[in-house]
Amino acid sequence: MSTTRPSQSSNNSGRSRNSARIIAQTTVDAKLHATFEESGSSFDYSSWVRVSGSVDGDQQPRSNKVTTAYLNHIQRGKQIQPFGCLLALDEKTCKVVAYSENAPEMLTMVSHAVPSVGDHPALGIGTDIRTVFTAPSASALQKALGFAEVSLLNPILVHCKTSGKPFYAIIHRVTGSLIIDFEPVKPYEVPMTAAGALQSYKLAAKAITRLQSLASGSMERLCDTMVQEVFELTGYDRVMAYKFHEDDHGEVIAEIAKPGLEPYLGLHYPATDIPQAARFLFMKNKVRMIVDCNAKHVKVLQDEKLPFDLTLCGSTLRAPHSCHLQYMANMDSIASLVMAVVVNDSDEDGDSADAVLPQKKKRLWGLVVCHNTTPRFVPFPLRYACEFLAQVFAIHVNKEIELEYQILEKNILRTQTLLCDMLMRDAPLGIVSQSPNIMDLVKCDGAALFYRNKLWLLGATPTEYQIREIALWMSEYHTDSTGLSTDSLLDAGFPGALSLSDTVCGMAAVRITSKDIVFWFRSHTAAEIRWGGAKHEPGEQDDGRKMHPRSSFKAFLEVVKARSVPWKDFEMDAIHSLQLILRNASKDTDIIDLNTKAINTRLNDLKIEGMQELEAVTSEMVRLIETATVPILAVDVDGTVNGWNIKIAELTGLPVGEAIGKHLLTLVEDSSTDIVKKMLNLALQGEEEKNVQFEIKTHGDQVEFGPISLIVNACASRDLRENVVGVCFVAQDITAQKTVMDKFTRIEGDYKAIVQNPNQLIPPIFGTDEFGWCCEWNAAMIKLTGWKREEVMDKMLLGEVFGTQMSCCRLKNQEAFVNFGIVLNKAMTGLETEKVAFGFFSRKGKYVECLLSVSKKIDAEGLVTGVFCFLQLASPELQQALHIQRLSEQTALKRLKVLTYMKRQIRNPLAGIVFSSKMLEGTDLETEQKQIVNTSSQCQRQLSKILDDSDLDGIIDGYLDLEMAEFTLHEVLVTSLSQVMNRSNTKGIRIANDVAEHIAKESLYGDSLRLQQVLADFLLISINSTPNGGQVVIASSLTKEQLGKSVHLVNLELSITHGGSGVPEAALNQMFGNNVLESEEGISLHISRKLLKLMNGDVRYLKEAGKSSFILSVELAAAHKLKG
C-alpha cells in the first residue's frame, strides 16, 4: 500500500525516517536564516513560510553549503550576552586561551572611579587564571580542572582578587579546554555556597510538591499547574507550555500572563519558528536565558594558535541570533527564559535491568517558555531550580504519555470489536448500511464504498463524480499497490485536489478487489484548530511580513489548509485488517465463515472464574500465612483479625487463638492508630499502600522488650466479583534496625562509632555533607555495592556516586535520579521524609532493590550539616512472603497464559482455512470442493472449541467435558494436515501419510475436534524442528479390546517421526510439567498432553540417531458396535 507520508511500522525504519525529516527541516531552517540575513528589513516572513511549507520529510533540498554554513554559525558563534563574561582555559596549564572583551573590566577592575596603574592584573591570552582570583577561589577552580563531571560542581562561588566582587563560575568542558561563564552575584542575593542540586531544590520545593500531588489522567491540568508554578517562581510577565507535534510544528497548550498582554493560548507555529539546531541545543542545555534582546553583544577573542574555533553551545551567556532577536522584538518581548521538557522516545524499548545496556533514547517533547516586556535577569541558582522543576515535570509528562498509550491500546481492542462485528454482517454492504459502520473504525470526516460500480457515501465526502475520478486516478498511478494513504491529496499528485480542499484533503483508500474500493476522508488540519487568544478588532490588520506569533499562526494555517491530520499507525492497521476481511469475504462468503463473535467475546471479555480457582487460592493463602517466616496478619472488612500467623504470635507474645476476633486498632500502639486506620481504609477501597511503618503492642513475656516495629505492605483480598472482602498485611520486623537508628539520630556528638561498627544489625549507611559531597560509607555499604570507602568519599553523592552515567552506583533512569535528589533535598531542608523504594546497580552489575530512609545530620547547635541515608533490604523470608501479595494478581496472569495459549492454537485452524480456500480456487471438481469445504468447517469448529477454553486449570486438572461423536481417523488426519501445509510447503518439508487405509476408515467414537487439535499441534512442532527439505512421517496402529457384548475399546497409537536435532529440551520439560510454562510451544505442548490424558492417553518422545518421534496414545470406542 503506497503512502505519501512515512508510517512508523517499525522502530528502525521510523527512526530513519525521523532522521530524514529532521535533516530536511534543518535545510529549510538554514534557507530561512540565509534569506533573513540577506533581506534584512524587507524579509517577508509569511510568504517564505508558505513556500517552504511544501517541503516534505522525505524530500531533502540540495543546499548542503547553505546548511553547513548555518550550522557552523549556530554552533560557532563568537558572541555572548553582556550580563556576564567568559573565559576559556587550557586544562593543563590553567591559562586563558579565549576571553570575552568585557572580562578584563568585570574581573580585574577595582570599584573606584579612576583606576591607577597596578590596580588590576592584566587579563588576556596566556594569563594564569589563578592570578585573577583570591586564593580560596583559585583553589576551587584548580580542583574543578581535575574533576571528571565538572558540571556537577556548578555554581562555584569565586571572588576577584582586586575588587573582591563575588561571581558564580559556571563551568563546562569542550574539546581541549574548559569554558567558564562568570555571572555577577547581585547585592540582594545570598550567595550559594553549595553545589547546585542541593541548594536550588529549596527554591523549587513548593512547585515540586504541588506537581507530585497532582492526580494522573490530565495532561491539561499538569501543564496548567506547571506554568502557574513557574510564573510564581520566576516572576516573568508570561509563561507558556509549548508542545511539539509529530510533524515538528508547535502549539501553545497552556499559558498564564499578566493582565493586558495578548494571550497566545491555542496558537500553532510552523516548525521553522524553532529551528532543529536550536532544538538540538535545548537537548544539551536544558535552560536558556536571554536577559535583554536589545543589549549589544560582546565579542569573544580566542588565541590565534588554537587549531579550531571554540564552540559556545554550552555557555549560559551565548548570544541569541539576529533572527530570534527580531522575533522577540516583534512580539514585544525583551527577555526570555526557556526550559526544555525532555522525555523518553516512544520508539525505544523500556528500561532494562541490565547494567551494560544504554539508557533510553530521549526526545524534546516541548518547552516551558517565559517572556518579559522589560529586561530580566534570573540568577543561576533560580535557573538551576527551574531546570530541576522541568525534570520533575518531564517525568509526569512521561507518565501521562504512557497513560495515553494505554488508552490507545483500549482503542485497538475497540477496533477489534468493530472488525469482528462487521465480519458478522452482509459483507461488504453491511459496513455502510448498518451501525456501527466504517466511520466508527477510525477518526474521519467521511467515508465511501465503491462497490460493483455503485457508491455509498457517509459524512463529508467528495461528490460521486469526484470519487470516481479518484478511483480512476488510483487505477492509473497506483496500480501496483493495494491502496493509498495520504494527508494531502495535493502532495500525492491527484489533479483535482484543489477543488476538494474545502471539503477534504486527506484520504485512506483500500482495494477489496481490483475495482472495488473503500475510502476514508479527512478535512484539512486548519478546520480542527482554534485559537484561544484575543480576536482582531474591526479594521485591525497584522503585518504578515513580520515574524510574530499571530503571523506564524496565519502562516501555519496557510500551510495546513491542504493537509489533514496524519493517519496513525494503529488506524492504518485497523483499515488493513478490514481490507483483509472484506477481500476474503468477497472470494467466497459461504466457505470462510469464522465465528468472530466468539473471538470478540473471548479476547475482550476474558475472565477466569470458578470455585476450583477460588479454593486453590484460598488454600494457598492459608498455607503461606501459617508457614511464612515473616509476620503476616489479615482482617475482614470490619477490621477484625481473621489471620494471625505463628511468626507474629512469637514477636508479640499474643497467641493465635487470642488474636482472632480482636479489632486490629486495639492491637497497635496508640501512636500508630491513625496510620493503621488510614492504611486499612485505603486497602478496603482497593488502594494498597506499600512500605508503611507502624508499631504493634506486645503481650505476656514480650512486654518488657517494648513494642514491635513493622514495615508493612497491604494486599486487598477479593472475591470472584472483584469485591474487597478483607485485607492481608505482609510485614518485616525492623525493631532491631529501628533501635539502632533511633540511637544514631539522637547522638549529638561522634557518629563514627555507629557508622563504622561492623555489627550485622547496622544497616547500610551513607551520607553527604551540606555541600553535597559523600562523607560517610559504612562497611555494610561496601559489602552491598562493591565500592570501597576511599573510592566514593569526597565525590558528589548526586552524580558521581549515584547517577545515570559514569557513576559508581548507576541508577536505572533519570526519573530515579530526580526522585533521589528530591528525597535528599527534603531531608536537607529539615522536612520529615518517608521511606521510599530505591534501586541501583552494584559494581558487579547486580540490581539492588531496597527501601531508603533519609535523616538530617545536625551539629551541637542544632544546625543541619548534612544527611544520613539508611538502606533496608528485604530479607529472603520477606521476598518469599511477598508472594502472597501477588495472589490477587493471579487472575491477570492466568488471562495472559490463556491468551498465549489461544494465540498459539488459533494459528493452526486459521492456516487450514486459508489453505483450503486456496485449494478451492484451483479446482473444478465437485467432490474435492466438498472435501475442502468440510475441512474448512472442521477447522472452524476446532477454532470455536479452543475459544471456549477459558479455564486452562480445568484442562490441566482434568475437569473438561469431552464432546463425543462418531468420526473416522481419515477426517481427523485431513483436517490436521491442512493446518500445517503452509508451514511445510514454506520449508519444503514432505509429509508422508503411512496410516493404513483400514485404520483411516475405521469408524470411531470420541472427541474428534480435540484429537485433531492435538494432532495438528504435534505436527506443527515436528515441522518446526525439521530441517528445510526434510520429511515428517505419520504412522498408526490400532488394537481393539471387547468390553461386554456390544462395546469394543479401541487403543489408537499415532507416531509422528521427524528428522533433525529434535524438539528443544526446554519445550519438552514444559510439556511434561517439569518447568514453568514460559514459551508458546511449551504451553501448547503441555495443554495437548493434558488433552490426551483426558482421553485416557499420553505422549512419549523418543530420540534416535538423526530422527525423533512423538508417540501419541488415546482410548476411543468402535462406533459400529455402539450402533447395535
Curated annotation (Swiss-Prot):
The keyword Manganese does not apply. PROSITE patterns: HIS_KIN (PS50109), PAS (PS50112), PHYTOCHROME_1 (PS00245), PHYTOCHROME_2 (PS50046). Residues 901-1120 form the Histidine kinase domain. The keyword Chloroplast does not apply. Residues 218-401 form the GAF domain. Keywords: Chromophore, Photoreceptor protein, Receptor, Repeat, Sensory transduction, Transcription, Transcription regulation. One of its GO terms (molecular function) is photoreceptor activity. Gene3D superfamilies: 1.10.287.130, 3.30.450.270, 3.30.450.40, Histidine kinase-like ATPase, C-terminal domain (3.30.565.10), PAS domain (3.30.450.20). Phytochromobilin binds at C323. GO terms for biological process: detection of visible light; red, far-red light phototransduction; regulation of DNA-templated transcription. Residues 617-687, 750-821 form the PAS domain. Residues 1-21 are annotated as: Disordered. Residues 1-19 have a biased composition (Low complexity). SMART domains: GAF, HATPase_c, HisKA, PAS. Contains one covalently linked phytochromobilin chromophore. NCBIfam families: sensory_box (TIGR00229). Belongs to the phytochrome family. Homodimer. Regulatory photoreceptor which exists in two forms that are reversibly interconvertible by light: the Pr form that absorbs maximally in the red region of the spectrum and the Pfr form that absorbs maximally in the far-red region. Photoconversion of Pr to Pfr induces an array of morphogenic responses, whereas reconversion of Pfr to Pr cancels the induction of those responses. Pfr controls the expression of a number of nuclear genes including those encoding the small subunit of ribulose-bisphosphate carboxylase, chlorophyll A/B binding protein, protochlorophyllide reductase, rRNA, etc. This is Phytochrome type A. It comes from Lathyrus sativus (White vetchling).
